Amino acid sequence: MRYLPPRLEKPDPRFEANAGCVLLTHDPDAETPALALHLLRHAAENRDALAQSVVGWCHLFGHHLPLDPVRGAHFLRLSAEQGHPDGLFWYGLCLCEGRGTRPDPATGKQFIVRAAAEGNYDAREWLDEQQAPAE
């Protein structure tokens, strides 16, 4: 079964990122995740911030892609540099925890604060947890 139109002369990275995300979360057969990851990787290599955040997250946690925190942090940093809320949060967390990069909690928290300001739910939750009194 084909999910996409015939090969485009110059694929649109945002289309590839969106299609990859949809296919990755709707797994009807064994070939779908491979196609999704192909689309996401291609879009990430073409500077799509959404794709970079998804590929980075997948590498960071070893979900759908090999566990590789350094590669994960790399893609998340690229996404964060473009201001993508998920990239900001996950790269900030990498910095706070030293996952795939040298620890820098102060800078990491700045990224997470920016992610929360952009509406990232996980960032808001993380900040709330950091402000909660220790039990």
Describe each model-derived feature in a short phrase.
Residues R2-N46, L50-V54:
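N-terminal segments that cap or nucleate solenoid repeat domains
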Residues Y3, A116-E135:
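Terminal, low-structured helical/coil segments at or just beyond the last alpha-helical repeat
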Residues P11-E16, T25-D27, E45-D48, F61-H63, ...:
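Short helix-capping/linker turns of helical repeat alpha-solenoids
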Residues D29-L39, P66-F75, R102-F111:
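Structural signature of tandem alpha-helical TPR/SEL1-like repeats
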Residues A49-L50, F61-P66, V70-A73, R77-L78, ...:
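Tandem repeat protein-protein interaction scaffolds
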